[in-house]
Amino acid sequence: RYPGAFEPMDAAYDDQGRPQAYLIYALLVCATKDGRWLQFAQVSPKLIGAWLTELDLLGELADPKWQGFPMLPTPELRTEWWDMMIERVGARTLAEWQHAMTENLDLSGELFRTPEDSLNHPQTAHEGRATTVIDPDLGPVRQPSTLIHADGKPLTQLRPAPRVGEHNDSVAFDQVGGAALPAPQGDHHDPPLKGVAVLEFGSMFAGPYGATLLADLGARVIKVEPLEGDNIRNLVAFPEAGGAKVLQGKESVAIDFTKPAGLDLVYELAKRSDIVLQCFRGKAAERAKIDEASLRAVNPDLAFVTTSGYGVDGPFAHRAAYAPSVGAASGLARVDSHDTGQPPTDLDDLHRRAVKLHAGGAVPAVQSDGIAAHGVGSALLVALYAKRRGKMLTNVVTTMLGTVQQAMIAYNASYASRPAETPADEQFFGMNALYRMYRAADGYVFLAAPLPREWPALAKAMSPYADLHADERFADADSRTAHDEELIAALTPVFAAKTKLEWENELCAQDVGCVEVVEANSELVLQSDPYYEAGYAVDAHSPIFDEHRRLAPLCRFSRSRTRADAGCTIGQHTDAVLSEIGLDEAAIADLRVREIVGGG
């Protein structure tokens, strides 16, 4: 509907390392007085106000110079404000900042940890989300516990990985525990979750997108929003664009449930729901009387999943969590930034390191919000499945931090004989000569032939351009490892001689893994015409954006279809949903006048 009205920013910093995106200030990366790196998390209006107050910068906004903050017009002004914040943070030690975050509940920040050290996080220790498994070959293995916790402990006791065929004699493959499931009624086209009603309380992305995944599978998801709407709707400069993805397929009901009449409406919705997703910090849901106990009092058959950044209790439960802060706490940012977390030597060095650490926690395709949301979707399905099998789970909890630690298990699991990780090179081209990017004539290709059995095909394919077979430095896997830099040097001019698609076509035809590198956001690529025609993207109709493309649902089924709807406006479905629970037009109008409901 609005072509050209909004162009997403490619990077948070410009080519000179100066801030471009206003969220840099809310999500400040900075070093303390004693050289420890912190990732702050102050995105909502309330939190950014608390942040500027803590830094004693709120009064500065009275100066006309800063008009329009945080969207300052020039790189010079943006950098000047950035440096003011850096100076204020750098005036305190890590211990002083940790004390401030304990005293000020609207202040949140995380130390940039390694993946292994992430399992020492105070909240991880409090919840028991790190455990030790005794492996018969490796000995004690320290690793994350289960993705889902129930009743304050891991959903199941972790066991060592089984040996091949270890349980062949002990498993009766024709027996299934629990209640028998109904047999499929032939071919049909209903979505797999048709008839499931999800009631969602949450904001932003990491929790709510878990319910979006269920909407794609056919669940009816009713999102209860405050009258002013979820903050994510206005997170980017173009109104509603920030929430377009997370609101897909949902019905929005705007209710002020801080008022008794609004809370009564919530209880009526709970009576008609199968499962609730609650995404509030700490004990906020309990204070609002929409916690598990309160809602099960009106519907005992209600499945319930609680998710937040850090859990329902413990030292960090009250803190806000956003993708960058959880990326710092989990070790994700350190792995993807190559920064060792060393103290900065001067302001220029601080700028450079801050940009790298930010980039490590903000890779669009793999960042903490998306990882956590898939954990939430999994927990919702587990809770629904358990309910269907006649076992109602209670106090089902996932956390952003715990879920991202699960995704980092290849990096955070530790045991005595664990080999050292092979890091990517400094420029992030790849891991070694046979698993990395190379510059082609018109861009880059990625070569993926790291296994010894793949070498003969690669050497043969390259024989018109370089005689790799005859070079003793590359005779076997050990030699190639010892002469990795020389192998890179041998292949670099070869790849530079042809275009990326020429290399992809030529090498793939000879069973050598090689693809062109597309230098664009993966979601934009997957919505381009070739991928749209292949089914990776579909058309949806939004009340805000009209017809547009969106990514297709993640799953496809042999007998069931999925849904791929667009988002909704604030309270778009308020009237329709309230009518379903028995309210007439006059009653709804009265609630709107009293500012108990909105939208419609």
Language-model features, listed with the residues they occupy:
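Active-site-adjacent "lid/gating" segments in soluble enzymes
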Residues: 1-43, 49-53, 149, 217, ...
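Terminal low-complexity tails and localization/encapsulation signals of metabolic enzymes
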Residues: 12-16, 31-33, 84, 113-200, ...
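Ordered, small/hydrophobic-rich secondary-structure cores
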Residues: 21, 46-87, 91-155, 460, ...
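N-terminal helix-loop segment corresponding to the beta1-alpha1 unit
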Residues: 95-97, 133-134, 159, 163-392, ...
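Alpha-to-beta junction loops
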Residues: 103-109, 219-222, 272, 300-302, ...
